[in-house]
UniProtKB/Swiss-Prot annotation:
One of the GO BP terms on file: DNA repair
Primary gene name: ruvC
GO molecular function, one term: magnesium ion binding
InterPro entries: RNaseH-like_sf (IPR012337), RNaseH_sf (IPR036397), X-over_junc_endoDNase_Mg_BS (IPR020563), X-over_junc_endoDNase_RuvC (IPR002176)
Protein name: Crossover junction endodeoxyribonuclease RuvC
Species: Dehalococcoides mccartyi (strain CBDB1)
Entry's localization field: Cytoplasm
Assigned EC number: 3.1.21.10
Residues the record lists as binding Mg(2+) 2: E67
Biological role stated in the UniProt entry: The RuvA-RuvB-RuvC complex processes Holliday junction (HJ) DNA during genetic recombination and DNA repair. Endonuclease that resolves HJ intermediates. Cleaves cruciform DNA by making single-stranded nicks across the HJ at symmetrical positions within the homologous arms, yielding a 5'-phosphate and a 3'-hydroxyl group; requires a central core of homology in the junction. The consensus cleavage sequence is 5'-(A/T)TT(C/G)-3'. Cleavage occurs on the 3'-side of the TT dinucleotide at the point of strand exchange.
Cofactor: record remark: Binds 2 Mg(2+) ion per subunit.
Signal peptide stretch: none
Reactions the enzyme catalyzes: Endonucleolytic cleavage at a junction such as a reciprocal single-stranded crossover between two homologous DNA duplexes (Holliday junction)
Family recorded in the similarity comment: Belongs to the RuvC family.
Keyword hit for DNA-binding: yes
Amino acid sequence: MRILGIDPGTLVVGYGIIEAANDELTLVGFSSLTPPACAPIPQRLAYIYKGLVEVIELYQPDEVAVESPFADKNIKSALAIGKAQAVALLAAANHSLPVTEYSPACIKSRVAGSGNASKEQIQEMVRLLLNLAEIPQPNDAADALAVAICHHSQRAFTNIISQGDLT
């Protein structure tokens, strides 16, 4: 199962692709898309869409996992991230790929065992779970890999529950 994880944003979109075979995770690729910061939002979103389409066509994922926006105090920022998230959902839908969205707390819990884990703890767990020498850079790509790992973990848990094998 090849999973594309996406960490959406209007300034930087991180993406990471993992291959999951049984309990073994393998890094396939990762990077980020950085639209011109001075461009208007519609042009940035078009840049992100085009880039994600290229990623999907290059890596041929089976499923896509996207981090959902976190709305704390900065609603304007959450709305902007929501626009980038919608573009990611559209790119996946236009390629008939199943998409699952995960909250930041769910990703932290699945990857590091705590919904309150720090960004550094998540990135270190990504490094360990993918058996890497260094934490992937840029940070947005490491975050996207965490989204993909979260999706794999959730799928594995769902499979165990559906089989009734809780021993």
